[in-house]
Amino acid sequence: MKKYNLINKFILIVWISITSCNAQRTAIENGTASTVNEKNDFSFKPGEIWNDTEGNVINAHGGGLLFKNNTYYWYGEARGKTASQGVNVYSSKDLYHWKFEALALSPATDTLSDIRMGCVMERPKVIYNKKTKKYVMWFHLELKGKGYSAARAGVAISDRLTGPFTFLKSFRPNGNMSRDMNLFVDEDGTAYHIYSSRENYDMRIAQLTDDYLSVTTKDSMLFSEHREAPALFKYQGNYYLITSGCTGWAPNKASLHIAKTLFGPWKQVGDPMTGPDAEHTFGGQSTYVQPIAGKKNAFLFMADRWNPKNLKDSRYLWLPVQFKNDVPFVNWMNEWNKNSFDTISN
């Protein structure tokens, strides 16, 4: 009798294990798994639903990364179906698994604030100022009820990586319209604001003040080609700038410019995307290029595949940057991992 009981218990344990595995597999396939399998799920799947470590869909659009204390921090737009809900921040040690940290910058309840509920905050980027020991956030701001006519840069500050950030001000840099934007800190610690201006016809760059809170008068037009979504990075002494065309939420062809100095001259060298649907940036739009810590000459291209009917459901396209004769390109991959940085030819 004991022998039969042991056999029955063994069969029951096996049946429970198989059932549990099948249920977990189904949950993962359906995007309903409450946790991520951190032992096995080490790959990027561009355009697929991406959940955080709590099983919630990551909500950080038009964003950028900051690497600090051996951790990556991802700042991006918190979006409802259409509403702008502030700026979220996530953290990760490996770039695959992201923990939600906080709503780093919230819309204000003060009806006189530039960032009161109903405003639009887009493309947030955060940099660290070593002199002031402050984290500084810049973003594209549109005032409540003004459509896209305000065209301002917003600035916020925090003592902590995860915030909360305190909104300081919004303005037009040197009187120029400022829409899609990015930040870049050069090797000497000087920071720059790259932004679309004059109804997006001009791409401009302005050097920031030492505290990173304002622009200086060193502000110049890089080129006038009706571009937006700037993503700037540096490699082997050259500066590279990836931008998109201006077609609303619809994807379009990316463009690559190269320069020896940030203020130019900048040379246009074509579309850096290759592979299926490259002429539409794989259905996405550039937002940031991140150097990969611990890997030589490794860069991550970040883009958003916008869903204008439900902005919260816009997907993320993360792909490795490759180089040929010092000219970067981004090739489509359905799935990849960080080992690709070791095998691609830079």
Task: Enumerate the predicted regions with their spans.
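Bacterial Sec-dependent N-terminal signal peptides
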Residues: 1-34
